[in-house]
């Protein structure tokens, strides 16, 4: 029989997973092409929260994923790279997908939603980085 978690336990587990992913990406170098693309959109990756980053899977863009910008926007990005690891012209996508995330601080029976938990983790990590 699987263990049933309370809403508070589920929230704590989700928040811990978000922190773990964010800390993992903050501890590793991100592709220069992604840094440059983010900078061109006014996003400093050192203060952003990388939620997902995939690199060079067959039949997929060379770099793609999701992040939460320092100003609270959820972004989906993707780009193909040339042999010098620069974005190929016309291959860069940078889309604000914030509308897809529920930012409710509390929903009856469900607690804080994923988008709100991401924002809390972003604030916590950026406070501790100062």
Language-model regions, residue ranges each:
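Low-complexity, intrinsically disordered/propeptide-like segments
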Residues: 16, 37, 48, 52-54, ...
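Hydrophobic alpha-helical membrane-spanning segments
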Residues: 29-46, 66-68, 72-75, 80, ...
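Phosphoinositide-binding peripheral membrane targeting modules
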Residues: 51-109
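Canonical pleckstrin homology
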Residues: 98-130
